[in-house]
């Protein structure tokens, strides 16, 4: 019975995050990652050489291979992986279909402006509310 309820919960959660999950699957096809791991929250974390930074959409996080090394004991222990998979992944679970218009759109606009219009500072990117919240949820201290 417990296993059945867990399966139902996972199905409901996948549907709750369906817009992000669909977009995440599309981006997986585009970026064709080379390495995959499962994060602590059950999200899938992919490392792709074609990805410039990182993005989390529902159960799927795609992170630049720049942040991955073969000799890593725990690749998901990096701040970038925690920020993406655990931080933004938890935001997606909380907000469901509101994640893309609230967090996703804000983050994309911020990423486009940061460094181009807004002056670059060390860890300044992570001071924006969506990124600061993702760091907090992911347990990242900068």
Regions found by a protein language model. Name each.
Residues 85-103:
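Catalytic Zn2+-binding segment of zinc metalloproteases
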